[in-house]
């Protein structure tokens, strides 16, 4: 049989088939099956800061005390992060191939916090999925490209695992 071993972002892969972030990669059981079926690496379903905040906002009630809203927001954040970190740990236990976490954040502090926790949970690498809309008011030529570079630099200063940047079609 032909040897398909390769490397990607410093990771040794048995073949170049990398399962992308999707609903197919949102459970350790599914990831185990993908590994058994021959995948070379798996990118976990992305963790979106925006979805966490949206869920928290949906539970806010103007009749609540502000402290209650803050508590709910923090609880939901911690719960969602815990679920994601558990997915990493459980996938690592059952998969003999690299597990790549994926995050999408919109606040600078969360890029760093999420990256640290993901590395500590045992992910082999981190995909950063940056969405930048050029319809934003503060857009100037090159500003989104610079934002990508800045986020990457901050994350690379913080963690040791490989970082992969997912680029959208809105960059020049």
Residue ranges and their predicted role:
Residues 2-172:
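Active-site entrance/lid segments in N-terminal catalytic domains of soluble metabolic enzymes
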């Amino acid at each position: 049989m032909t040897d398909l071993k390769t490397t990607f972002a410093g990771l040794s892969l048995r073949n170049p088939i990398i399962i992308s972030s999707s609903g197919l990669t949102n459970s350790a059981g599914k990831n185990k099956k993908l590994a058994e079926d021959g995948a070379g690496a798996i990118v976990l379903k992305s963790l979106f800061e925006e979805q966490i905040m949206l869920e928290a906002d949906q539970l806010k009630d103007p009749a609540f005390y502000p402290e209650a809203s803050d508590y709910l927001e923090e609880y939901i954040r911690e719960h969602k992060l815990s679920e994601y970190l558990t997915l990493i740990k459980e996938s690592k236990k059952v998969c003999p191939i690299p597990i790549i976490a994926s995050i999408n954040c919109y606040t600078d502090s969360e890029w760093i916090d999420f990256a640290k926790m993901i590395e500590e949970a045992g992910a082999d690498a981190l995909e950063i999925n940056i969405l930048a809309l050029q319809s934003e008011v503060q857009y100037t030529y090159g500003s989104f490209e610079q934002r990508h570079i800045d986020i990457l630099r901050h994350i690379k200063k913080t963690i040791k695992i490989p970082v992969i940047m997912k680029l959208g079609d809105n960059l020049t």
